[in-house]
Amino acid sequence: MSGMVALWIPRGLWTAVVMVTLVMLSTPGAEGRDSPKDFVYQFKGLCYFTNGTERVRYVTRYIYNQEENVRFDSDWDEYRAVTPLGRPDAEYFNSQKDFLEQTRAEADTVCRHNYQVEAPFTWQRQVEPTVTIFLSRTEALNHHNLLVCSVTDFYPGQIKVRWFRNDQEETAGVVATPLIRNGDWTFQLFMMLEMTPQRGDVYTCRVEHPSLQSPIMVEWRAQSESAQSKMLSGIGGFVLGLIFLGLGLIVHHRSQKGLMR
């Protein structure tokens, strides 16, 4: 795995930016042409990582009015001019042995150091997904429908979602949304399964993710309308029972207070 990160640069290199600006503006090439009243001078420090910190490439770029003039690359181990205007600067930097050694060392002191500091909050960060299942339409058994597996609030984005029907993987009629960024370093996606539920069918959404020790498996069971009605009635009765129990306790508590008076 490889990547590129722009990281914090120490004060020494910012001093170098001022120094190289003065050198550049004092060169004969700069004096022989009109110098704009307003100009932009940029310094960019880039760290390239391969397999974590197994291989680190450090690059610094000096840019004057959107034109790069000088560059240091740890693969070269020295400064080189990108344009003729940058030749005096590259020669000057390479002649400053202490400064050159400092720049060479920054593959470790800047890149590798900041990699370890930032890792727990960036590429090593992991957030477990939340998985739910729902039908797109409330329909009776034996009617075509769409079963949706919602996988939300996970990081990183690498994830595997599969549908199973009665322990057999379903591949036909499976449609997934693209990975959706939530804007807070988490993702979500939806995996839909076209199906015609039969009584007794058990559908399972299986989710595998780096943050999980084992896959998350959420089930949905096909039920007849009468079974659903009985279940809802049972839930409703249980809730009403809790309400009446609570009211009874309140009345009993108040009556006890009245007797004590």
UniProtKB/Swiss-Prot annotation:
Region (Beta-1), start-end ranges: 33-126
Could you say which residues form the signal peptide?
1-32
Q: What does the UniProt keyword field contain?
A: Adaptive immunity, Disulfide bond, Glycoprotein, Immunity, Membrane, MHC II, Signal, Transmembrane, Transmembrane helix
The segments labelled Connecting peptide in the record are: 221-230
Q: How does it sit in the membrane?
A: Single-pass type I membrane protein
Q: What are the Ig-like C1-type domain coordinates in residue numbering?
A: 129-233
Tell me which parts of the chain lie in the Cytoplasmic compartment.
252-261
Q: Which GO terms describe its molecular function?
A: MHC class II protein complex binding; peptide antigen binding
Provide the family line: Belongs to the MHC class II family.
PANTHER family xrefs: HLA CLASS II HISTOCOMPATIBILITY ANTIGEN, DQ BETA 1 CHAIN, MHC CLASS II-RELATED
Q: Indicate what this protein is called per its UniProt record.
A: BoLa class II histocompatibility antigen, DQB*0101 beta chain
Q: Which gene is transcribed and translated to give this protein?
A: BoLA-DQB
